[in-house]
């Protein structure tokens, strides 16, 4: 099953809606998430494996609104956005926690503890 007519970037596909889901994760406090120049998705999920700054069994899941990604300025000197870097064939990199989750005060859609 593919969405958007492409085979790019999907880690999972929602069997009910057919949406392509890209999953990003980090196991350190300050993530540096990388996207490919042709990355596409219908739904983006960020998995924080260290929500308290260290890996302790807690895992928090966030759904990230795509509209919050494409216009993020990643290079202030050149005023380059995420989309600009993709169009240049580059791999945009930034901290989803610092640029989206924390400033927007996003709440996890799911929290689990592997130790319970």
What is each PLM-predicted segment?
Residues 1-20, 24-116:
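Nucleic-acid endonuclease domains
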């Amino acid at each position: 099953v593919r969405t958007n007519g492409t085979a790019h970037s999907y880690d999972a596909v929602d069997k009910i809606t057919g949406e392509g889901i890209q999953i990003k994760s980090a196991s350190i406090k300050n993530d540096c998430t990388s996207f490919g120049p042709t990355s596409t998705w219908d739904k983006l999920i960020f998995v924080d494996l260290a929500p308290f700054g260290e890996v302790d069994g807690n895992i928090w899941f966030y759904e990230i609104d795509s509209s919050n990604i494409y216009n993020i300025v990643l290079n202030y000197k050149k005023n380059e956005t995420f989309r600009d870097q993709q169009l240049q064939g580059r791999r945009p990199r930034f901290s989803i926690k610092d640029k989206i989750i924390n400033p927007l005060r996003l709440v996890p859609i799911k929290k689990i503890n592997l130790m319970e």
